[in-house]
Amino acid sequence: MEIAAETTGPAGVTTDVTNAEESTEQPATRYMQGWALASLTVAFMSICLVLAIDNTILATAIPHITSDFKSLNDIGWYGSSYLIAQMALLPTCGRLYAFYNIKWVYCLSLAIFELGSIIAAVAPNSMSLIIGRAISGLGAAGLVSGTTTILSYCVSLRNQAMLSPIVLGMYNIGSAMGPLIGGSITDNKVLTWRFIFWINLPFGAVALVLVWFTLRKPPPAVKGNLLWVQKLRQLDLPGATLLLGATTCLNLALQWGGIVYPWSDSKVFGCLIGFGLLLITFLCLQWRGKENANIPLRIFRSRTVSASCGFMMLVQVAIVVQSYFWPIYFQSVRNTNARDSGINLLPLIISNSLSTLCAGSLASRFGHYVPFMWVGPLILATGGGLYQLVRPDTPSGKWIGFQILSGVGYGCCSQMPILAVQVVLRKPDIPTGLVMIMFFQMLGGALAPSVGQNLFTDGLLRNLTKVQGIDATAVVAAGASGFRAIVPSELLNAVVDAFNSALRDVFWVGVATPALAWIASWAMEWRQLPDSKKKVTETPAEEGREK
């Protein structure tokens, strides 16, 4: 591969990969250029595209999946299983790149992601689909952390500044394409919804070939010389297992409580107790592990880091709930097909992407990011609150406007926590701070579908019991798009109203969580982005000391 020597050492993905002293003593680092750099960029663009499509393509297919599997109660798990696995294993996967050959770890992560897609595509029942999504989430954790790591190891800072927006821009494109592709595939009687998982394979194959032949001589692992016992200790596998178990228990409680079982039932209560005990054990383990822990607790001594993590989790809950349940409104209440529901979701996705770019540009120009964290949640909450005005016959102009408000609100503020941690933390701590922001963002995304599902199913059952002549359990079992086949025509409007009313309960989450995020934003330190010249040569902490 074509490479060039520079004197700037690459940054790691965790605080124990590099430190301030090491960065000044490292020899010249050889970076990619030319065709090798272009090939790697295309590979990462392909990966970002498939990950983005995979995140959004499922939303428009869920109503059909619930109808095929008679599994309306599993809506939350189709998204949560993927995000829980990705969230819980992200720090551990990130550390694998410090210990082992980055080429092999990345390619193995891609293979695991594709394996999960195959399992989901051939799933004979709902549980198999959930397992496949969880396996894909494990692979995605390795791909997300690996893309950042390989860029820092193999691409100069100057080229990173140019390539990162291009690579990440594919994520926005994929997010917009996902609902359209998912809807079109789901409506096709030949392909069916299963093909939305098969399409991951060609993208992954292209990326695998490019990465494999581009990284013929990958840089050595920065901690490859450690003993296997030391590597195992620093991976903190017990911590990852405890976190995975705690989050699963919480999701089971949210899925069952008040729907499958009463909240007072021993199964639900046991899951909540299990969540509490596992969480306490996990926190104790992180405290004892210090720098070897998955989540170094000392990083949260900074109030900006703590506020940013909480803020990111809360706004993520709001946007994921809306992304998952707007398609259910379109398909169950308005009786649109999956393709059209994907088109109808574009105002939310496009406004989100455009406002993210605009907010980032404005923050970079004026140097302040905190005001966007004040304004964004208020706009996001307004968009969620206005859903209370939505009815089965609401004109399209209104629900398009409501989605645009939500997208603009989220886009205004979603990137600001990432900037904040880079401003307030010392350079060696910045990678860990960024991982924590990603971690809490994924945590919010993992919890959101289950919270929304619980509110939706509980409200739907409650509303259906008021409609005489309707078997509420049968309607729920029929799924979000299949209930019309079993409901008498004279009762259809009442059942549709029951769906719409239940969805209004869900969208209150889109009001409450941004409001809490707005409160959290007031804990942010009022800091300014360093100017571009100082940003190259100094860390934010060093700049602050000079002033």
Curated annotation (Swiss-Prot):
Keywords: Cell membrane, Glycoprotein, Membrane, Transmembrane, Transmembrane helix, Transport. GO terms for cellular component: plasma membrane. CDD domains: MFS_Azr1_MDR_like (cd17502). PROSITE patterns: MFS. Glycans are attached at N463. It is a multi-pass membrane protein. It is found in: Cell membrane. The chain crosses the membrane at residues 33-53, 74-94, 104-124, 135-155, 165-185, 195-215, 240-260, 267-287, 310-330, 343-363, 370-390, 399-419, 432-452, 506-526. This is MFS-type transporter ltbE. It comes from Aspergillus luteorubrus.
